[in-house]
Amino acid sequence: MTSPSLVFENDKLILYQHELGEWDNLNHLIICKVTKHACIIDPFDGRFWYDFCQNKGVKLTHIWLTHTHWDHVKGVDELLELTDNQLTLKCHILEQERGYSSDKASWWTHGEFSQVAENFGALEFSIHCTPGHTPGHVTIIGNEVIVTGDCLFLGSCGRPDLFGGHKEKQRQSVLYLKNIFQTLSPNSIVLPGHYYQIDDGSIPKNSILSDFLKINKAINSAHDVKLWQELPFLSFDDNMAEQARRQRAKES
């Protein structure tokens, strides 16, 4: 297996990105330079990240989840087992609405379209509740880093037609984040949960914020309900959509 790519570094942190799994998941490991503590976001493979941290001589202390679809939590239990449950696992409590539970988790409880501060090592980030793809999806921002999970991809956004998703809340989350982005350095790095081809034919895995704001169709359509409704990536006629319809019917 290939090694993670060092995709961003400043005076406070080092950030590694790695593709894992058959769904092109992008995992992100943030290392605090001061304390040598590390936080893994949405781990797909627990053993992979445990071994990587051991080899790097850093202490993995935190797991943060942008949301709880299976491909974003697959490595959580293995990491907890490998570290004798010594990791801090954080997730938004609204993810319980789609059935996620863990007796090892600590829960963010702030409201939709709002933020709270969260620390690990000597680093502070803001955790923004951005529902739509799932009820308790969060976007992680701080220190020139933006981890969008499945709320926003580089050219599009996550689908809101799965169980627990909500198309209008997804639009509101995109508008909310667009306003937040206006306050950030244009050289901040945007890190999505998956990567797909964009209009110029390239398939980037990250982008600086200034470029991202130009190419992202969701960001540039969310202000207009009609344009938003016409976006082709908000819903799909596939097995996952059918499963979501059945789950909603079961819960109603």
What does each of the following model-derived ranges do?
Residues T2-S5, Q172-S252:
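Accessory terminal helices/loops
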Residues S3-K56, T139-G149:
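Conserved beta-strand hairpin/beta-sheet module of binuclear metal-dependent hydrolase folds
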Residues D24, A38, F44-E124:
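Active-site HxH/HxHxD metal-binding segment of metal-dependent hydrolases
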Residues H28-L29, S114-I141:
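Core dinuclear metal-dependent hydrolase active-site scaffold
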Residues P43-D45, T68, E95, G132-T134, ...:
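Active-site metal-binding loops of divalent metal-dependent hydrolases
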Residues I63-V73, H128-G136, L191-Q197:
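Histidine-centered catalytic micro-motifs
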Residues E97-S102, G155-F163:
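A short acidic, helix-capping loop that chelates divalent metal ions and anchors anionic groups
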Residues C157, D161-F181:
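Active-site-adjacent loop/tail segments of enzyme domains
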